[in-house]
C-alpha cells in the first residue's frame, strides 16, 4: 500500500496513528492538554462520517513531502542499507492503532525521515537527538512492526553538502512502548464511549 494514496487514507480513517501519539499523550499540570481532546474530536468525526477532513498543508509541508525520496536515497548511499517502502501497519493487539514508517530497513530496522525548516535541522544536528514527538512516533512504529531500531534522518538540501544530512539510530524502548500502549488504549476506550454516548443522545 503506497502512502498518501486513497487506499492509505482509507486504512488510517478513525485510527490513532504514530504521528499523532504525541497528541494522545500531551499533558499539562492540570491534566490532559487541549491537543488530546482536539485529536479525539477529529477521530470521532472520521468514524461517524467515514470521511477525513483535509488537513492543513503549506509550502513548507509540501516541500518536506517532495524531499523525502531524496533523503531516502541519501540514506541508502550513506549506509548501504536496503529500504522497502510500506503502508499502514496495524498494531498487533490494539485495534484502531497503527503506524506508517517511511521505510523498512533490512530485517530488524526502520527509517523515519524529516525534512524540516533549516533552523530545526541545525538544532537537531546540535542536540544530536530528535524531538520527543518524533521519539514517540518511532517507538510506536517499532511497537506496530515488531522492529528493533529506527534510523532518524533529518535532511535539508539548502545547506552545504556536509550539513544537509543527519542520521541517528533510536533503539527500541519497551518501557516507553508499554506507556504508549497504555495511553493509547485508554484514549481509544474514551473515544468509543463518547461515540456510544452520542448515539444514545441522538436516538
Please describe what each predicted stretch is:
Residues 191-203:
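Charged, low-complexity C-terminal accessory regions
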Residues 41, 72, 138:
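Generic structural marker for isolated residues within well-ordered, non-membrane alpha-helices
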Residues 30-31, 70-74, 153-158:
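Intrinsically disordered, low-complexity boundary segments flanking structured domains
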Residues 53-56, 70, 111-114:
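Extended, charge-rich alpha-helical segments
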Residues 61-83:
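Acidic-basic catalytic patches of nuclease active cores, encompassing PD-(D/E)XK
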Residues 79-101, 105-188, 192-194:
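Nucleic-acid nuclease catalytic cores
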Residues 15, 27, 114, 126-131, ...:
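Context-gated lysine
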Residues 1-66, 201-203:
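Charged, glycine-rich intrinsically disordered N-terminal tails and low-complexity linkers that flank
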Amino acid at each position: 500500500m503506497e502512502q498518501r494514496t486513497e487506499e492509505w487514507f482509507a486504512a488510517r480513517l478513525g485510527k490513532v496513528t504514530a504521528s499523532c501519539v504525541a497528541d494522545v499523550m500531551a499533558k499539562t499540570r492540570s491534566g490532559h492538554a487541549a491537543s488530546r481532546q482536539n485529536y479525539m474530536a477529529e477521530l470521532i468525526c472520521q468514524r461517524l462520517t467515514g470521511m477525513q477532513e483535509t488537513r492543513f498543508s503549506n509550502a513548507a509541508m509540501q516541500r518536506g513531502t517532495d524531499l523525502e525520496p531524496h533523503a531516502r536515497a541519501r540514506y541508502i548511499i550513506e549506509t548501504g542499507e536496503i529500504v522497502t517502502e510500506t503502508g499502514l501497519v496495524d498494531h498487533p493487539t490494539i485495534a484502531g492503532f497503527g503506524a506508517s514508517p517511511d521505510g523498512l530497513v533490512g530485517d530488524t530496522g526502520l527509517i523515519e525521515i524529516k525534512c524540516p525548516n533549516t533552523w530545526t535541522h541545525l538544532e537537531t544536528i546540535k542536540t544530536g537527538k530528535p524531538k520527543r514527538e518524533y521519539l514517540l512516533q518511532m517507538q510506536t512504529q517499532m511497537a506496530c512492526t515488531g522492529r528493533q531500531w529506527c534510523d532518524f534522518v533529518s535532511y535539508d538540501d539548502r545547506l552545504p553538502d556536509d550539513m544537509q544530512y543527519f542520521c541517528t539510530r533510536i533503539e527500541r524502548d519497551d518501557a516507553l512502548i508499554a506507556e504508549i500502549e497504555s495511553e493509547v488504549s485508554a484514549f481509544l476506550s474514551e473515544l468509543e464511549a463518547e461515540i456510544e454516548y452520542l448515539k444514545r443522545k441522538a436516538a
